[in-house]
């Protein structure tokens, strides 16, 4: 299926924060993707996990990959008068109840793909109520209330209220075991399922407008500011009079001691239980208008959010205090339709009104922002929205007005991206080096040649300029590939092709700059200007890794001037093969490990002199270094050496053989680490973090298990670079990217363990589809049906193409890990009893413990059965008997001839 993925809208918390949209991916669906029609009128998710959409040309089911359409066609037997469906509800038996454009009711069974018209309907349907016992209740505009019992063949109907009851609206139905409480505009009725008896419980000359079950009580709002409180256990009621003459049109729970009551055109009340009306909020205190459109109490701070009928404003109120604040919605045109306020599973507050744009509350910016669903940022007007739906994975489904379906999949806010807070700073900001200084400032070197400095909270302080001070004007100093602060407080910067820059402190964030470059006339100058690594050992010696000149050591002459020791002077025995150094690692014994493009060079001290041990790939040795192109070497807190090789993946040094060759364990496999790790870093819990071209890996060293944070988590299009990762003193981890500084808190890096429903969709035997009865009873096949295919899928709507599967035919093979393949194929399976098992990850890559299985029995052929065995035995006996008889006859004939 051809799906159109929009460019991911990124949420980057700039320094200081610049507030953008939540990180998300937009997926657009159209007729080309399988929609029967582009006017979406209803959205819901069934109990299996399928998404259902109603349109003006039938209904369709979506499994995350493809749409299946159900509608009436010429000549078929479906009892559907029109394909224009306007609403949908799903009952406890996963049956779909549909209303067409004339409010005629139909039931659709997904199992047999059949539409049934509700023949007992006598007037347009006003409400559909689906209860947990499987019953569906229907209220018609003529005042009839009907109960429909679950039955696959027919729709058994019982009339509960007729038109003479004078009921004009049903507010709610409340089920309590065998009792159904009917909350109507004329009172409360009690229906017993056991004897079918209907009993009027509470009536009033006034009309009821609202209902809420609160702390075991039934609370009903009525005319003239009257609130009826009914106790179903005691069968008693009381009336609480509010200070208003207007109807109480809506009731919402606030907490266990308070609830909210909206009065028509007279604000709202925050009650103190049943003790009185409590606080009356109107324009006289904190409201902008007395005409309330919607109320919402958030889950985070228990604040009350108020939307109005006649203005595009929102008010936030902190109860039991004088605090309140008004907010302006970002909307291009205002209409007076009903607003809805709700929070998603991440606690984000959304405001929706039909045919307007969508707003959300940004807590850090403390304002409502427009949620953009435009194809590009240059569109002057946002598309209008007809309907929204949040599924249980927090995906936001949007039906556009007039046409189109959009899925918004939100990413967890696990990463923070920091860039210079400078207007016009380029979005391309490829980082090559990161360092935390002694004052906990963060230094960042970029490929574009500037030096960025942030404070410990990652607030941007400025760019280092050639005067040694910070400025908000970027200045080219050289592409900085290495950063080091030595024990004396000096900062050393290694550049690509510009040599070394030394920053000598002259005060707080004020430095004197000294430059060191290769000088052919001075043998004690730097021998190469391409600097890729800087390290200081325990003795205070600074080592320089160059890309072309090998290893340099910085020392001082008798006058205190820096000079460089390298292969051109006192390190004349340095192996020239290892001249291209990518990184330096100094272990706890002060051994120097050089990561080079030609392998590893281990430098050990022997009588104040370096000795060299090459460690390279040996194609004839199974456990040798996996690749000579080494990007990084890292010593863990347990003094274990890990090696990142470009193309060979991650290696761990486990020891040396008798010849001194390194013995390695490799971690690169489809289930573990990428074969292109860029750099290595360890968090405070002893886990290894490995940036790669396809994401950020975490390797749990205790059990060698891995996690990957790829484009499902990272901002879209963000690439990690091979800049050495940095662990801060507060245990945050910093990584370089092509767009800025990426930071994480390792303890907060968790993938969602949500488990979606894994189903076996169908089985094909010799190319023919099997009936779905196998789902409950298993399947028995003849010996001629020993080749089959099984289709399966996990109904995870977030990133369905990222779900991985594994299957096996227990008793025949082992687990097959097949990535995103959703079909298992078996051919020529011998007779026997088997169990097909399949498992999957969720969209975040977390494997589920739930295994879907189905028993499969392949019967033997007649010749393999017990009857065939008996027949074989009989034939054998006959052959033996006949042979014996023939031999006996021959023997007798011979005797006669002899006589």
Describe the role of every protein-language-model region.
Residues 1-887:
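Carboxylate-rich, polar loop motifs that coordinate divalent cations or form catalytic acidic clusters
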Residues 882-899:
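Cytosolic signal-transmission helices at domain junctions
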């Amino acid at each position: 299926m051809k799906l159109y993925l929009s460019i991911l809208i990124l949420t980057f918390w700039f320094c200081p924060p610049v507030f953008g949209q939540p990180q998300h991916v937009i997926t657009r669906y159209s007729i080309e993707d399988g929609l029967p029609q582009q006017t979406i009128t209803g959205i819901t998710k069934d109990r299996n996990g399928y998404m259902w959409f109603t349109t003006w040309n039938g209904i369709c089911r979506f499994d995350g990959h493809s749409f299946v359409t159900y509608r009436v066609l010429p000549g078929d037997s479906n009892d559907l008068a029109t394909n224009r469906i306007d609403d949908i509800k799903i009952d406890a038996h996963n049956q779909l109840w549909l209303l067409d454009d004339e409010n005629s009711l139909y039931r659709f069974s997904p199992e047999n793909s059949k539409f049934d018209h509700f023949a007992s309907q006598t007037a347009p349907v006003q409400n559909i109520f689906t209860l947990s016992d499987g019953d569906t209740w229907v209220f018609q505009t003529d005042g009839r209330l009907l109960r429909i019992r679950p039955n696959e063949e027919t729709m058994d109907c019982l009339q509960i209220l007729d038109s003479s009851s004078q009921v004009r609206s049903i507010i709610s139905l409340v089920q309590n075991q065998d009792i159904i409480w009917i909350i109507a505009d004329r009172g409360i009725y009690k229906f017993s399922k056991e004897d079918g008896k209907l009993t009027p419980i509470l009536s009033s000359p006034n009309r009821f407008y609202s209902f809420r079950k609160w702390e075991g009580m039934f609370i009903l709002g009525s005319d003239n500011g009257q609130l009826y409180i009914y106790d179903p256990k005691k069968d008693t009621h009381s009336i609480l009079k509010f200070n208003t003459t207007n109807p109480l049109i809506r009731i919402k729970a606030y907490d266990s001691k308070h609830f909210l009551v909206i009065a028509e055109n007279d604000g709202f009340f925050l009650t103190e239980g049943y003790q009185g009306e409590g606080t009356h909020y109107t324009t006289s205190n904190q409201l902008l208008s007395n005409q309330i459109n919607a109320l919402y109490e958030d889950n985070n701070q228990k604040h009350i959010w108020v939307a109005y009928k006649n203005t595009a404003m929102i008010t936030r109120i902190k109860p039991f205090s004088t605090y309140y604040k008004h907010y302006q919605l970002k909307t291009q045109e205002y209409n007076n339709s009903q607003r809805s306020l709700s929070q998603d599973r991440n606690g984000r507050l959304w405001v929706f009104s039909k045919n307007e744009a969508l707003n959300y509350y940004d807590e850090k910016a403390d304002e409502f922002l427009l949620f953009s669903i435009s194809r590009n940022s240059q569109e002057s007007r946002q598309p209008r929205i007809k309907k929204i739906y949040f599924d249980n994975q927090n995906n936001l489904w949007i039906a556009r007005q007039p046409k189109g379906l959009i899925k918004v999949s939100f990413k967890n806010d696990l990463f923070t991206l920091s860039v210079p807070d400078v207007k016009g700073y380029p979005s391309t900001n490829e980082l090559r080096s990161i360092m935390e200084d002694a004052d906990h400032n963060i230094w960042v070197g970029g490929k574009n040649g500037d030096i960025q400095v942030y404070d410990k909270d990652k607030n941007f302080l400025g760019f280092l300029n050639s005067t040694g001070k910070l400025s908000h004007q970027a200045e080219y100093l050289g592409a900085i590939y290495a950063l080091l602060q030595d024990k004396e407080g000096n900062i050393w910067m290694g550049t690509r092709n510009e040599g070394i820059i030394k920053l000598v402190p002259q005060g707080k964030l004020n430095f004197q700059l000294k430059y060191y470059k290769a000088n052919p006339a001075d043998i004690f100058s730097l021998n190469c200007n391409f600097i890729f690594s800087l390290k200081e050992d325990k003795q205070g010696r600074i080592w320089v890794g160059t890309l072309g000149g090998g290893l340099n050591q910085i020392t001082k002459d008798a006058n205190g001037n820096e000079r460089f020791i390298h292969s051109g002077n006192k390190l004349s025995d340095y192996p020239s093969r290892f001249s291209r150094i990518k990184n330096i690692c100094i272990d706890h014994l002060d051994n120097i490990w050089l990561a080079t493009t030609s392998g590893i060079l281990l430098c050990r001290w022997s009588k104040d002199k370096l000795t060299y041990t090459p460690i390279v790939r040996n194609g004839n040795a199974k456990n040798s270094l996996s690749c000579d192109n080494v990007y990084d070497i890292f010593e863990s807190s347990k003094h274990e050496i890990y090696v990142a090789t470009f193309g060979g993946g991650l290696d761990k040094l486990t020891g040396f053989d008798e010849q001194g060759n390194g013995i390695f364990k490799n971690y690169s496999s489809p289930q573990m680490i990428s074969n292109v790790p860029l750099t290595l870093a360890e968090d405070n819990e002893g886990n290894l973090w490995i940036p790669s071209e396809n994401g950020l890996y975490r390797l749990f060293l205790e059990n060698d298990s891995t996690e990957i944070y790829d484009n499902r988590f990272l901002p879209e299009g963000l690439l990690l670079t091979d800049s050495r990762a940095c662990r801060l003193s507060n245990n945050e981890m910093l990584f370089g990217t092509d767009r800025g500084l990426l930071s994480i808190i390792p303890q907060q890096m968790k993938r969602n363990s949500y488990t979606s429903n894994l189903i076996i969709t169908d089985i094909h035997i010799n190319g023919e589809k099997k009936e779905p009865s196998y789902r409950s009873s298993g399947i028995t096949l003849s010996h001629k049906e020993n080749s089959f295919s099984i289709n399966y899928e996990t109904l995870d709507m977030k990133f369905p193409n990222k779900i991985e599967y594994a299957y096996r035919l227990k008793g025949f093979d082992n687990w097959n890990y097949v990535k995103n393949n959703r079909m298992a194929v078996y051919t020529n399976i011998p007779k026997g009893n088997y169990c097909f098992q399949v498992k999957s990850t969720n969209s975040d890559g977390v494997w589920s413990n739930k295994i879907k299985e189905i028993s499969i029995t392949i019967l033997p052929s007649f010749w393999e059965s017990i009857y065939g065995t008996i027949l074989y035995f009989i034939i054998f006996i006959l052959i033996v008997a006949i042979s014996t008889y023939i031999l006996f006859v021959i023997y007798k004939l011979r005797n006669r001839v002899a006589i």
